[in-house]
Amino acid sequence: MSRKLCTLNFTLSGKQGSLVIRDIQLWSNRPTASKSTSELRGQFIQYVDLAKLPLWVRSTNMNTYRCYSTSATAQAYFKSKLRNANRGIVIELSDKVDQRSQEPAYLIIFRENTELNCFQVDLTMKHEFDGQVTKLKQEIGKTRASVSKEGSIDIIIQQSQQRKIGTKTKVYRNVHINDKRLQFNETLSKLILGGLRLRGISNSITDYQKLYKITFDAAEFTHRDELKRISMGSVEEVSFESLQETVETLLKLFTKS
């Protein structure tokens, strides 16, 4: 039997100020010890691609909660932002912490078919990884401290291995940068083509290619600062919403009769 666990309200911060998404009810099919319902407060962090989340984010025995809301604002928000089935919304809970690390706790809200669900990010495996890495670093430090002149060949081998790792890291970094730029180009192209179709502009129309190209070039110029930072290895990405807004603005300008 389903039981209401709590109600979640979280804040969206934007250029026009803050908007609070209210009355998100979390329900569970699993029995719980507590009979009362609580109210959680949170802050929107970012959107994520569920298919690209690390394996440690979700454990096999974790709870998934069903989400409901009677708020028209909340319903419209989720309908707009979760059109893509792989997209998730990350919420940092303001008044709840991870029991092991005492770090903030996080919820990820997502859509599964027509249902709205969420789960709490499981940090247990991450902490285990962090502990193993710390232990390994300590062991390496002790080994280096005990190396004598007779062990100089080991140092040479280790330095050679580190150089190889550094080269691989650099190659990986370049591949990652290229992937981000390719993703930007693909998303931008799809948005432009979709915008042209919505306006009834067929590729058989004269200057179709010219209109596509000037829109593409203008969008690149608009986001030149973000693209420059990406080319320098930044982890940030040009958000889908920002790129969509840019394309819509440009097409309105270029197709104005």
UniProtKB/Swiss-Prot annotation:
<dbReference type="InterPro" id="IPR041564">
    <property type="entry name" value="Sld7_N"/>
</dbReference>
<comment type="function">
    <text>Required for the proper function of SLD3 at the initiation of DNA replication. Binds to SLD3 and reduces its affinity for CDC45, a component of the replication fork. Required for mitochondrial morphology.</text>
</comment>
<keyword id="KW-0963">Cytoplasm</keyword>
<keyword id="KW-0235">DNA replication</keyword>
<dbReference type="GO" id="GO:0000922">
    <property type="term" value="C:spindle pole"/>
</dbReference>
<protein>
    <recommendedName>
        <fullName>Mitochondrial morphogenesis protein SLD7</fullName>
    </recommendedName>
</protein>
<dbReference type="GO" id="GO:0006260">
    <property type="term" value="P:DNA replication"/>
</dbReference>
<keyword id="KW-0131">Cell cycle</keyword>
<dbReference type="Pfam" id="PF18596">
    <property type="entry name" value="Sld7_C"/>
</dbReference>
<comment type="subunit">
    <text>Interacts with SLD3.</text>
</comment>
<keyword id="KW-0539">Nucleus</keyword>
<dbReference type="GO" id="GO:0005737">
    <property type="term" value="C:cytoplasm"/>
</dbReference>
<comment type="similarity">
    <text>Belongs to the SLD7 family.</text>
</comment>
<keyword id="KW-0206">Cytoskeleton</keyword>
<dbReference type="GO" id="GO:0030174">
    <property type="term" value="P:regulation of DNA-templated DNA replication initiation"/>
</dbReference>
<dbReference type="InterPro" id="IPR041260">
    <property type="entry name" value="Sld7_C"/>
</dbReference>
<dbReference type="Pfam" id="PF18636">
    <property type="entry name" value="Sld7_N"/>
</dbReference>
<dbReference type="InterPro" id="IPR016808">
    <property type="entry name" value="Sld7"/>
</dbReference>
<dbReference type="GO" id="GO:0005634">
    <property type="term" value="C:nucleus"/>
</dbReference>
